[in-house]
């Protein structure tokens, strides 16, 4: 502020300067900003700002501060209040001036970076610089490109070299918001594979200027939920920050030290991580648990953190990380910039208040409607719980076509050739299934043959023939992972496995083998569902269906990334159908059965020649072939257990463990909504044997129900179209045909392809006939029971009983059929049935009347009910009433609807007369019209539009909408203890005891009996005492290191203040040398000995002094009194005295033995 006043005073604005000083308030912020960007117009704008008429902006800070022009108001305040008010005004003005200065500096640097970035882009496009600086053809300029964001030229060059020419939508909106001044918190949401990692790494590197800061303290902190994700972020960040050239100042070198990165994850040695943190890293990528452990153990000062990122924020803020984040957030400074990124984020930012967001964060929420990639194709299979393993083997062998055995990874030359082929294929406008598409575009243009080997962005070392078959399998628990690992390894597949409690070194080895293509399958829990980029991955299998839609989005997000195609295969049991219905509501996509969809697509034509189903925008549910399932089930139950190998012993044990884990897993997961449970029950009921009997009785014997699930009699008729025709979808058979073509050549391939196509069609035809025959056999119901075989009439009581029972069941079956037909007519799903009923209504009425006369003496009431429901007393609908009574004039919408229906059905009803056709069309129009009472213009629903998706995104959806009212009320209620009843009495605690295995007895289980000691941190949070064990102090004493305080400057020689031993030390031990030069001393000093020879000691005097004799006597007396026995001399003296008495004829001593 003082600088601005001096500047204005030098320009002749003394009056305005004096008025500004007396007011002790800041100028208008807009004016200050503009003046800082255009210094030559400051005086003019300041004059304009001083006019009361021309200043339309209102400054809250200026209005709240007292002005010198108001003497009355100032006079009413005391001197201390006036002083405090002036001090507050000065602080506000200083802060605003700092913000204006920072904004001005940022704008100047941004303009300079944009200008320099354009030069970098031009050089790259024109090809003036050869080698690494040369880029492929493409447009890299424009409003949405990276160089228009004001990035540093070195960072822009690094992005362009690696093929990142155009930012993704999330990067285009998030990066400018993050880099704005003053810094603003950002909450970003975009689907998986959309580039969220670069959206926060690019501003991070640009903010650190690509160089290491000599000031001690962490500058940026990135928190992520899993270790693999942390390693991936570290690899991407180091790659982007490589090759940075800093701006050289006066007397400085442009080649400074690169950014120091640190990764802090669990499973690693604490001593190594102590050394990493003492190395003063700039960026720390960590998991919350281990980072909190180091923070408490080392007592880290996090006040220097300016940039905090919560990657996969919805997972971080769930219950598992509440304690870790609470303590860490209290240690972070309030002036930090906080970023939250995830693929599934709720719209309500109230759920993220723990992150300490500022008052006005920016929400960037993209792809909220699509949620998953448009290149992802999904297939859902209905399976029995006991046949899940068999279904997995059928899927891997017959559909995906995963090869058996461990595959050898390609060498670097073959990989480079493959990347060049992939880049050439992209010229046709198609996205290759090879990895590293962006990298391949630039890689083929460079002359550096080793450049591509350094950056394997799509996954290092993937083998060419393994790319279409790399598959990741998601399971519920680690016990399922171990069980499937044994099963698939025994079957012959090369598998890797990862779960949370696995050792970190083993996890790295397993992931590396899968990335290099040696293993075809990766069996994991949900620990690998977050953020891990596996570009070679094309197939994702959900062995256990995810209970939450958010989990499904993250699982299938591992494939179909960066424009590549991908497949998601999900197995669903009848118990998991409600979760599938919840997923359908969350994705807002239709859920249809495979046989219904393919029949509608064929439209009366041959099913084999129909087009492929739209698996991108629909959820298609089908079954698997029964023959293949039976073969695999027999293999698992017999072949694996009836051997003498160790597998036969381990397999049943692991299966039992997995079954028990499944039971506990089902108890712990959230429940689906009540509406989804209702729909799931209806789906299961439609394929039951009772509904099949109803259809058979009504003359629809050959009709397949809409929903035919696994275990129903007609499941063979509902096999998924992907399994029946995999070549249509480019799966197993197409890959085999390509392999045969490459092996035999194009000349000999014509006959082979034709012969193979004929065989495939013949096999498909035979499979369809076999499925139809098996479906008829499964749906067969005999006309007679075992009590009626070979018996005529009512010869036996059991035969008469079954005959009467059958008549009663027929009545109930007809009643259920009528109810089902009416329900379909109301819901709009029975249009075809209504047409048939209109044509055959007279025949049905005549048949029912004949049945009434024949059975007049039996079940009159029941037949009357059936007749009432079907014919005699059928309730008239709205169309019949309107046809008989013209009560009101039809509305405009009704007239338009009738006209549209008339124009569509004229061709099909041209043979009828005009009056009859008009009446029929009017009635059909009224029946087909929606019967809902909701007017879209005025109806207010009890739910907000899009509430289903928001419930799926919600973090606490386990108790928000899935539970009943009683459960929700119990979660938020609390009880108060009655004071009157126990007033004046001592409350007794229950006698809770537990068995101690060491003491072999029951002991009292009191507080602290579990031996879990807690400590309270400075912020008041209680943490386990193991977080402060003193290992860091021991490590400092062992390494002889003194950690600098936050904000201090590093020393030139050492990164930390290390008390290093002398240079001549050996193995850390001190070694001193004689370096002092002085004259030797005379020999008289040492006597006859040499220098360094020890002194000769005199002989020990053996004559005791009186004091020593007295001490020895005292010690001897103490020993005698302690022993309580007479000494040996006393015993001898007593014996001699007795002998003398016996010699003189006297008696011995009293009590002596004779």
Swiss-Prot record:
A GO molecular function term, named singly, is: ATP binding
**Which keywords has UniProt assigned to this entry?**
ATP-binding, Helicase, Hydrolase, Nucleotide-binding, Nucleus, Ribosome biogenesis, RNA-binding, rRNA processing
Among the GO biological process terms of this entry, one is: rRNA processing
List the biased-composition ranges (Basic residues). Answer: 844-855, 918-927, 1134-1154
- Going by the entry's taxonomy, the superkingdom of the source organism is recorded as Eukaryota
According to the UniProt entry, what is the EC number of this protein?
3.6.4.13
Query: Which residues are listed for ATP binding in this entry?
Result: 190-197
Q: Which GO terms describe its cellular component?
A: nucleolus
**Segments of this protein annotated with the region Disordered:** 16-58, 417-462, 826-859, 885-939, 1043-1154
* The name this protein goes by in its record: ATP-dependent RNA helicase DBP10
Q: Which organism is it from?
A: Mycosarcoma maydis (Corn smut fungus)
Q: Which gene encodes it?
A: DBP10
